[in-house]
From Swiss-Prot:
Binding site for GTP: 17-24, 64-68, 123-126
Catalytic activity: GTP + H2O = GDP + phosphate + H(+)
Protein name: Ras-like protein rasY
Record's subcellular location: Cell membrane
Example of a GO biological process term: macropinocytosis
Family annotation (CDD domains): Ras
Family from the record: Belongs to the small GTPase superfamily. Ras family.
Amino acid sequence: MTTNKSNGNLVKLCIMGDGGVGKTSVTIQFISNHFVHYYDPTIEDSYRKQCLIDDQVYMLDILDTAGQDELTAMRDQWIRSCEGFILVYSVTSRSSFDQVQFFREQIIRVLDRDDVPIMMIGNKSDLDDERQVTFQEGKDLARCLGMSFMEVSAKTRLNVEEVFNETVRCVKRREESLLKKDNSKDGKGDHSKKSSIFKKLNQKVNGAKISICKMM
């Protein structure tokens, strides 16, 4: 595939969540295939990676953001610049799980729409002895809030690549849905009601059950 084609498929993603949940670890594992044990707290880092997803080349522009409350104003700017979002909590931290809804509400408020492609992920799934949030709790919250869901491990790389791939797919499904809606405006049928409906597909990735969004 040509460079021009990949440049025409730039997808901007933002990874958000409470401090210390492993946002940077997940991102660097995806970008560089290695796990970082120690790093300085992130304010804002940007990464790029070319990926082949469903036989299509995409250039992913990934914004890794800070979780600190004092950076809320900056976070609004990050949200406006992105098309898809990955919300991270740690399965070893109940408080970070409780913050997921706050971050989702901020995204919805800033973008002023509720059909935003959002993937919710529970990181540190390898630390089962320290787990405070069950897989079912994560799945139930994601379903309630209309988000896709996976558990991942930045350390072992479990589901890390799948998270980014599925988020891109959700972004593209929304684009296709909006295009169909625009094309049907002058038609006889009214399909607009279906354009922002998410359907859930249960799949298995690396032996772990995941919940994936599909826009109709």
